[in-house]
């Protein structure tokens, strides 16, 4: 009789999530395990491929539900009356079925103008509850992958970062600063270029189904006073996935400032003491 070879577990592939591509193996994983694998690929700047399959995993949606449930806007309806109370395991199964066969249809967001503190108004887009959940699954994947690649000096709309960390960064690193760039991007969320954003995503994400899903969300349109409008540019302010898409887009500006402008305009490593402080 011949001897049997002992089978060794499949190792993670550099080209994909696993050499073993069976759906059953993937679906047994927890959302945290999946996101940790994606985060590791982001840290090593490996391409993100075959990621669409991760949207078949119910645990990804349960994680999104738990996160969104805590939000004050969980009971705010979009274009339908659907709210957090309408979510169930059966509803998640139907969402996954539509995602699996690329039959998922994004609903136009309900747009409402809300007052600004300094006067005027800004448009706020309110997706349906099911759209919020799917958007949050997409957000978690994009955030896990791109967060390790963002500049440490970027503080907007990022986990564990904000005004306080930005002020601390200024206090600790802005020594002898000689020049500043001041600017305001008006109507940023309304004017984000879809073509440029999708090209940026294609540089690292090698999964056309996942990219089509994101592009579909961008082009879902909006309804204002019961009139439908197409979305030719921008991403809805109020959309779950909008902040991470904005940061992916603006990361190019961060890199340009850090890698081009700062080295070009920094003449020496040490500034002379201001004579005022020598008196």
Please identify what each model-predicted range represents.
Residues 29, 44-47, 125-139, 147-150, ...:
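Duplex nucleic acid-engaging cores and interfaces of nucleic-acid transaction enzymes
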Residues 141, 145-146, 257:
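Hydrophobic recognition helices of helix-based DNA-binding modules
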Residues 44-45, 71-77, 116-117, 145-150, ...:
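Short acidic (Asp/Glu) and glycine-rich catalytic loops that position anionic groups and cofactors
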Residues 79, 140, 183-185:
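Residues immediately flanking
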Residues 1-93:
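Non-catalytic, polymerase-adjacent accessory regions of viral genome-replication enzymes
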Residues 152-153, 158-161, 165-279:
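Conserved polymerase palm-domain catalytic core
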Residues 97-120, 129, 133-141, 168-175, ...:
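Reverse-transcriptase-like RNA-dependent polymerase core
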Residues 26-33, 46, 50, 59-63, ...:
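Generic recognition of stable, solvent-exposed alpha-helical segments in well-folded globular domains
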């Amino acid at each position: 009789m011949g001897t049997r070879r002992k089978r060794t577990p499949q190792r993670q592939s550099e080209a994909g999530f696993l050499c073993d591509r069976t759906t059953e193996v993937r679906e047994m994983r927890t959302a945290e395990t999946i996101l940790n694998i994606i985060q590791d690929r982001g840290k090593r700047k490996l391409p993100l491929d075959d990621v669409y399959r991760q949207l078949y995993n119910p645990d990804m949606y349960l994680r999104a539900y738990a996160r969104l449930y805590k939000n004050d806007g969980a009971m705010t309806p979009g274009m339908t009356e659907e709210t957090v109370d309408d979510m169930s395991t059966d509803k998640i199964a139907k969402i996954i079925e539509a995602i699996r066969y690329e039959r998922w249809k994004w609903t136009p967001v309900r747009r409402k103008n809300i007052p600004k503190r300094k006067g005027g108004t800004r448009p706020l887009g309110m997706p349906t509850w099911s759209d919020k959940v799917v958007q949050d699954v997409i957000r978690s994947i994009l955030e896990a992958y791109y967060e390790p690649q963002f500049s440490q000096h970027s503080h907007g709309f990022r986990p564990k970062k904000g005004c306080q960390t930005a002020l601390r960064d200024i206090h600790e690193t802005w020594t002898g600063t000689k020049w500043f760039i001041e600017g305001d991007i008006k109507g940023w969320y309304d004017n984000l270029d879809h073509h440029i954003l999708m090209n940026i995503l294609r540089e690292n994400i090698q999964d056309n189904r996942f990219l089509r899903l994101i592009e579909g969300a961008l082009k879902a349109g909006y309804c204002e006073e019961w009139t439908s409008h197409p979305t030719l540019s921008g991403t809805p302010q109020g959309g779950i996935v909008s902040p991470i898409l904005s940061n992916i887009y603006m990361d190019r500006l961060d890199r340009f400032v850090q890698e081009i402008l700062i080295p070009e305009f920094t003449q020496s490593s040490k500034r002379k003491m201001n004579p005022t402080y020598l008196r």
